[in-house]
Amino acid sequence: MSTEPEGVESDSNADFAINASSFDYGMAHTSETLADPMSFQAQDLVVNLTGVERKVFVSARDDKDSLCNGVDFDADSDLLKNKDKKGFSKENLKLFDSDLVWAKLRSYPWWPGLVFDKSVASKAAMRHFKKGNVLVAYFGDCTFAWNNASQIKPFHQNFSQMQEQSNSAEFRDAIDCALDEVSRRVEFGLSCSCVSEEAYNKLKTQNIINAGIREDSSVRYGGDKLSDGISFEPAKLVDYMKHLACFPCYDATEKLQFVINRAQVLAFQQWKDYSHFIDYETFVRSVESAATLASLPEVNMDEGISAKKRKTDYKDNAEQTKEKTLSDLTVKKRCGSRSTEKLDGKSHSEKKRKVESSESGKSEKRIKKSQQKEDSVSKHSNEESLLSVGDTNKLQKTAEPCHGTGVENEMNSLTPTLKPCRASKSTEVENEKTKKPRHQELAERKISSPDEMLSSLHAANTSTGIPDSINIDPSNYEDFEKFINELFCSKLNGDSKKASITETSEPCDKKDSAEEEILPANKEITGSGSKEQIGLKDCSADSLPPYALVLNFADSGSVPSEEKLNEIFKRYGPLHESKTKVTMKGKRAKVVFKRGEDAKTAFSSAGKYSIFGPSLLSYRLEYVCPKRKKTT
């Protein structure tokens, strides 16, 4: 790693050199001279690793007017002298072949790249050669330049400052590629001969496709001095992992340290020869995504959710045009599977529709099952009745593993001991008179308290410096979840009872079979005809009471008419069309279903009626209190 003096951030004499004939796509990989891998011992642990060969699709930009100042990078160079087995060194510059650096170009920010000897320069690069400058191959595309010492800075020491220069897609992509190379070097530096030959070769080899590097020199081997076993500090890694477990986020300026620590953990995992190595990496990437989402500014619901906020730091029209054209190549230039995941509004919306579509089918199955089996309750329906559009987004992250989606399979294989969501979708509700007090029932079940459950989740942080596997009894979470569901149902009935009218009456005649299903389930009828306590139907009954679907819109102009609402929602089941109400002032619409099952199906399928577009802010289910009659 170079330790050059700070350069001046003025426009350099180095111009951008390119392949002037074509756009080339390929793997833009960093490389380095072969450094003898070292086995190391830290707390009696020998760390090995495997890695995946990282790729990025890049392009060489055509610029016939650009001029390049050359650099003499051989043994007689004024900058680099005394070539040895590990690379090049210089008394003043201390620059090594394949070092990671930041280099400055006119009209561009400081850009991450690799320094190379002129002996590997391509014909196109040698046409711009000038003695005294260094050949730099840039990350993110196939471009290169000849830079002098004042236009080069060490990568690690200046990362926090340099990464804040721009939010353009190509700049962020170049940084991701550089970080990917840092990760590879760290993993390679912690490797030893005990790993498989195939895995070891993937780690030590880098393939470079750059307009300034000859094809026969595109394969590079090894690591660097900053990434070997000597620089590894196990105690600091364990402290970092403990902190990350408690606070799973990090500042953008700390991303380099995060990548280094992650690579060290991956190396240790490979030494342990875990069969689900890729699953662990997926888990690490999910932490990166969580940190990215947590740092996003809040946006209005009608504008959608955007996890990628882009800013343009360059104001001249030429550079803005360049950014637009290269942004189309961003997807092709990603540096491999370890890049941070990014969500945009469209993909998030499509995922939401997919989840809600699958939930709709499951909802119908649960309805049929509830009609055949008494005393069963759908926990999912109760939870959904309180969700708005924003809450549904949260449901994707927290509830998907509970409903058998693709995320469940991935997370189950990822952390097989963490499965608090395996509780059954319906729970048996006992009769009010025969129920035991909840605290007695919990004591009999020996359910752990929330504090105990939380402490068990943190049990992996041991004093030995190595995270242990987390052993959690899933039955505790099943019983705890069942208890929460029953409390939720009881609270729902209790709140509804407050809004209902308690009066002295006897069983009443209903107009149709649908209303017969709405008979209060918790009536206590005495033979002498004394007072009957009229309550609401318990949530464990075999048929759901009528519900209204309430829709909230962004503005009054987007609220559809009552006829339009009836036409849209009658496909889910019979409606009380006369009760469909539209409040323009409140920007609200209400559709009343005759059967609760139909309302639930419509609610679960809310993502399908995209006819409302972004004007639909939220939707929820509202219980409709049935009318009561006195009979003799």
UniProtKB/Swiss-Prot annotation:
Q: Which residue stretches does the UniProt record annotate as biased composition, category Basic and acidic residues?
A: 313-326, 339-364, 371-383, 425-449
Q: In its UniProt record, which GO terms are filed under biological process?
A: regulation of DNA-templated transcription
Q: Which residues form the PWWP domain?
A: 97-158
Q: Kindly list the places in or outside the cell where this protein is found, as annotated in its UniProt entry.
A: Nucleus
What are the UniProt keywords, alphabetically?
Nucleus, Transcription, Transcription regulation
Q: Which PROSITE patterns match?
A: PWWP (PS50812)
Q: Which domain of life is it from?
A: Eukaryota
Q: Where is this region: Disordered?
A: 310-452
Record Gene3D superfamilies: 2.30.30.140
A single Gene Ontology CC term: ESC/E(Z) complex
Ranges spanned by the short sequence motif Nuclear localization signal, renumbered to the chain: 352-359
- Summary of subunit composition and partner proteins: Component of the PRC2 (polycomb repressive complex 2) complex which regulates histone methylation on histone H3K27.
What PANTHER family does the database record attribute to this sequence? Answer: ALDOLASE-RELATED (PTHR42851), PWWP DOMAIN-CONTAINING PROTEIN 2-RELATED (PTHR42851:SF19)
Q: Which family does it belong to?
A: Belongs to the PDP family.
Listed name of the protein: PWWP domain-containing protein 5
The species this protein belongs to is Arabidopsis thaliana
- Phylogenetic classification of the source organism: Eukaryota, Viridiplantae, Streptophyta, Embryophyta, Tracheophyta
